[in-house]
Curated annotation (Swiss-Prot):
Belongs to the class-II aminoacyl-tRNA synthetase family. Type 1 subfamily. This is Aspartate--tRNA(Asp/Asn) ligase. It is found in: Cytoplasm. Its EC number is 6.1.1.23. Gene3D superfamilies: Bira Bifunctional Protein, Domain 2, GAD-like domain, Nucleic acid-binding proteins. It comes from Bradyrhizobium sp. (strain ORS 278). It catalyses: tRNA(Asx) + L-aspartate + ATP = L-aspartyl-tRNA(Asx) + AMP + diphosphate. Pfam families: GAD, tRNA-synt_2, tRNA_anti-codon. L-aspartate binds at residues 175, 221, 450, 491. One of its GO terms (cellular component) is cytoplasm. Homodimer.
């Protein structure tokens, strides 16, 4: 018989009744029923009920057992007494009648319980992550994560992609965030960088003649904490293809992502034939470039109905041609209480308020806006929006470039408050035609709006003849349920176009050569047209596990202050380590 176990704690069935077996695992729950001890023994595979009665020679030791002690138990498998079966457990028809116990690893008093799923302070959970990972929900999430990555790999290989690993120690490059720098001992004063993404390497692979590449790539960004991103590192399904246009990337990747979602959606519908939504349309209709299409609400421009109207606040705004008025329909939201609640919410978001119109019986408009613009204009708004009796609409006015984010938040808030969002499906879409450039208000200059290596629509001619802020790029995202889960583009593979694109963003040719020398050099020796994308593994897993917290699908994450409470990172380096690296700390004054 095996030293520790003949079966796992999830393996025993009726067919094992009468067998003498050994199990090893953790004491999940211990109960004393009239002097008989019941121990739920747990391992990775499941739970088996073990029974120790006072006549057993193991009873004295069993009385000393506590939660999360690791033990080996030996005994006979028997059927549970009639009426005590547990249909929720695969082992729920049987129990182990224990004859012998060996303690393999006692446990100290627990800082957080493993049995049950009660909430606990996050810092405690992260400090004792090894205990937290024993809890069923988190344990299953991590197993689901592994299965999702397996599904990604299988589907990518079915599409003809090859998996390669790119370097982790590389050169620093401006890709939108700070790099994590690694000092070189061999080259004093010089630094490697951990890759923010394998962007240059995957493009170099295409120039090296490899046709289709992918990897599950670790990425590192030294960013300030954000609610929707783990500090430090994340993983992405990284993809690149040669001799492709945008539609070729879509045709290759849409079935991969759809298939992964269908594998793990637990029966929830997944969008087939994803819509293609231009970036500008997404902002206008949904107030975001990652719309939640489960929310049926679409915003509309209703400026004409307020131009020259009796509502002077909007009328005066519309004298400036760049200003607009957008309407957010609210089906079934035509109560004063709801409209006042939305108005208070808007004020809490730092806005002066949220104008509204309610439609009463007979289609008559009500509220301050309706009173100011009159019944004819109110009826025209109702006709445009398709609102009915008992509905409402909310209005946001000003420069759309400044209010679209708030309008999008208001659309989401209305959808949530009125229970319009279908929580039981995954709504996927391509967002296309991103602007190549944007105006950076902080630096007072034109900058890249997305990926600097993307091909501008119109190529070099567009870069030399058009206003940069009007140029669109062959860039695209995948949106799902209000999250951006992937981003990509067709690459700028011509050196003269690459130099011009960076020049517009304020980089001289020599700086481009210095920063991207390897790729710039490769462009001189025959670069194929190529493109690709990167899908966020963590966010996809988060969505499919039904959580909104990325720490619930990650093994050993940092906290929001970018600290690893389990391992004690970051930590101070020793004087010897610093001396070897020729580094002297220059700490800020406290």
């Amino acid at each position: 018989m095996h030293r520790y176990r003949t079966h796992t704690c999830g393996a025993l069935r009726d067919s094992n009744i009468g067998e003498t077996v050994r199990l090893s695992g953790w004491c999940h729950r211990i109960r004393d029923h009239g002097g008989v001890l019941f121990v739920d023994l747990r391992d990775h595979y499941g739970i088996t009920q073990c029974v120790v009665d006072p006549d057993s020679k193991a009873f004295g030791l069993a009385e000393k057992l506590r939660s999360e002690w690791v033990v080996r138990m030996e005994g006979k498998v028997r059927h549970r007494p009639e009426g005590t079966e547990n249909p929720e457990l695969p082992t729920g028809q049987v129990e182990l009648y224990v004859a012998d116990i060996e303690v393999l690893g006692p446990a100290a008093e627990l800082p957080l319980p493993v049995f049950g799923e009660q909430d606990y302070p996050e810092d405690i959970r992260l400090k004792y992550r090894f205990l937290d990972l024993r809890r069923d929900r988190l344990h299953q999430n991590i197993m689901t994560r592994g299965a999702i990555i397996d599904s990604m790999r299988r589907r990518m290989k079915e599409q003809g992609f090859f998996e390669f690993q790119t370097p982790i120690l590389t050169a620093s490059s401006p890709e939108g965030a700070r790099d994590f720098l690694v000092p070189s001992r061999i080259h004093p004063g010089k630094f490697y960088a951990l890759p923010q993404a394998p962007q240059q390497y995957k493009q170099l692979l295409m120039m090296s003649g490899f046709d289709r590449y992918f990897q599950i790539a670790p990425c590192f960004r030294d960013e300030d904490p954000r609610a929707d991103r783990l500090p430090g590192e994340f993983y992405q399904l990284d993809v690149e293809m040669s001799f492709v246009e945008q539609e070729d990337v879509f045709a290759a990747m849409e079935p991969v992502i759809t298939g992964v979602f269908e594998d793990f959606a637990k029966g929830k519908p997944v969008t087939k034939g994803w819509p293609r939504i231009p970036f500008a349309e997404a902002l206008r209709k949904y107030g975001t470039d990652k719309p939640d299409l489960r929310n049926p609400l679409e915003m509309q421009d209703v400026s004409e109905h307020f131009r020259g109207s009796g509502f002077k606040v909007f009328a005066r705004m519309l004298e400036d041609p760049k200003n607009q008025v957008w309407a957010i329909p609210a089906p079934g939201g035509g109560s004063r209480a709801f409209c006042d609640r939305m108005n208070s919410w808007a004020q809490g978001e730092g806005q002066p308020g949220l104008g509204y119109i309610m439609w009463r019986e007979g289609g008559e408009g009500a509220g301050p806006l309706a009173n100011n613009i009159g019944p004819e204009r109110t009826a025209a708004i109702r006709s445009q929006l398709g609102t009915k009796e008992g509905d409402a609409a909310f209005f946001v006015a000003g420069d759309p470039d400044k209010f679209w984010k708030f309008a999008g938040l208001a659309r989401t808030k209305v959808g949530e408050e009125l229970n319009l969002i279908d929580k039981d499906r995954f709504a996927l879409a391509w967002i296309v035609d991103f602007p190549m450039y944007e105006y950076n208000e902080d630096d007072k200059k034109v900058d890249f709006s997305h990926n600097p290596f993307s091909m501008p629509q119109g190529g070099l001619e567009a870069l030399t003849t058009k206003d940069p802020l009007t140029i669109k790029a062959f860039q695209y995202d995948i949106a799902c349920n209000g999250y951006e889960i992937a981003s990509g583009g067709i690459r700028n593979h011509k050196p003269e176009a690459m130099v011009k694109a960076f020049e517009i963003a304020g980089y001289g040719e020599q700086e481009v050569v210095d920063r991207f020398g390897g790729m710039y050099r490769a462009f001189q020796y025959g670069a194929p047209p190529h493109g690709g994308m990167a899908a966020g593994v963590d966010r996809i897993v988060m969505l499919l596990c039904g959580t909104t917290n990325l720490r619930e699908i990650s093994l050993f994450p940092m906290n929001q202050q970018a600290m690893d409470l389990l391992m004690g990172a970051p930590s101070e380096a020793t004087t010897k380590q610093l001396r070897e690296l020729h580094i002297k700390p220059n700490l800020p004054n406290k």
